[in-house]
Curated annotation (Swiss-Prot):
Signal recorded as keyword: yes
SMART domains in alphabetical order: AAI
Database matches in InterPro entries: Bifun_inhib/LTP/seed_sf, Bifunc_inhib/LTP/seed_store, Plant_nsLTP
Domain of life of the native organism: Eukaryota
Recorded GO MF terms: lipid binding
Keyword annotations of the record: Disulfide bond, Lipid-binding, Signal, Transport
Disulfides per UniProt: 29-76, 39-53, 54-100, 74-114
Protein name per the record: Non-specific lipid-transfer protein 5
Any one of the GO CC terms: cytosol
Family from the record: Belongs to the plant LTP family.
Signal peptide positions on this chain: 1-25
BP term (GO), one: lipid transport
Lineage: Eukaryota, Viridiplantae, Streptophyta, Embryophyta, Tracheophyta
Keyword Aminoacyl-tRNA synthetase: no
Native source organism of the sequence: Arabidopsis thaliana
Amino acid sequence: MEGLLKLSTLVIVCMLVTAPMASEAAISCGAVTGSLGQCYNYLTRGGFIPRGCCSGVQRLNSLARTTRDRQQACRCIQGAARALGSRLNAGRAARLPGACRVRISYPISARTNCNTVR
């Protein structure tokens, strides 16, 4: 019986310790790429920026509330950029937040160290 009480106490302590971490779950790459999906043609071919693209950039900015979210969004953006390879115009990607009237604290670049994003 004493062993069961210790086990129950340990389980409760673990739940209390990990609960704050679960509530700070980072944004998913699916949410990032979903938000930026309408930007694809602009980022690869140029032309005008679709209204839906800027809406997605603004939505992503509002979803990335915590440092952890912003770091994860940075990693997801870099992963998507790597997948696009030479089709991605890095200059357009770097200018996109400003063109959509969104201020972010880090440059959109393959060289950005996402661990330093706050």
